[in-house]
Curated annotation (Swiss-Prot):
Domain notes: The RING-type zinc finger domain mediates binding to an E2 ubiquitin-conjugating enzyme.
Main location: membrane
Name of the protein this chain belongs to: Putative RING-H2 finger protein ATL50
Bilayer disposition of the protein: Single-pass membrane protein
Catalyzed chemical reaction(s): S-ubiquitinyl-[E2 ubiquitin-conjugating enzyme]-L-cysteine + [acceptor protein]-L-lysine = [E2 ubiquitin-conjugating enzyme]-L-cysteine + N(6)-ubiquitinyl-[acceptor protein]-L-lysine
SUPFAM superfamilies to which the protein is assigned, alphabetical: RING/U-box
Translocase found in the keyword field: no
Native organism: Arabidopsis thaliana (Mouse-ear cress)
Amino acid sequence: MDQKSDSFLSVSSISFSYSSSTDKDFDLICMISPIVLLYITLLSIIFFVAALIHLLVKFLHRPQTRLDDAYDGITESSTALQGRYQTRFNLHDAEIDQSFIDALPLLHYKTMIGLRHDLSDCAVCLREFTAEDELRLLPKCSHAFHVECIDTWLLTNSTCPLCRDNLLLLGLTGTASSSTIVLVHESDGDNSQDSDSSFMLTDLDDVESK
């Protein structure tokens, strides 16, 4: 009977000892886990912030050569295009000296009847020419207009009202030339009305030298 009691006490002591050690281990694990979790969380946040700062610094210090070259190219192209448009605008709206306008050749419409079928009305006032009308002829394009119409037009414009040829681009700027411009009538045949005829501008000095 005594032996059984001793055995029971021994088993109970062992069980109590094991249970006590298990409870201590569990309590230790419960105490360590929150600390480890906190450290892991802090390290993750630190690594994330460091990576974000690294990317930001790399982005801010990236080479600007390509972007600067592209911007410079766009700026130069825009400036050149603006300059060309400004030049054309200035030429179109430039005023012509009155002395140059007065030097442009004059003719009477009756001398042109039957010779130029495209010359029937004034492109400025849109009125048809009559035999008594005095016209002024523009060089190069050979378009003619009423004297008062084209003179008023050229005071504020430097282009032909009909074809938009620019008189300034033709080198006809400033004051009138010292030589006199005359209208020469060229005919390929006899004096018949059906023969091909044309008009040209020439310098009176060249005519006299011939």
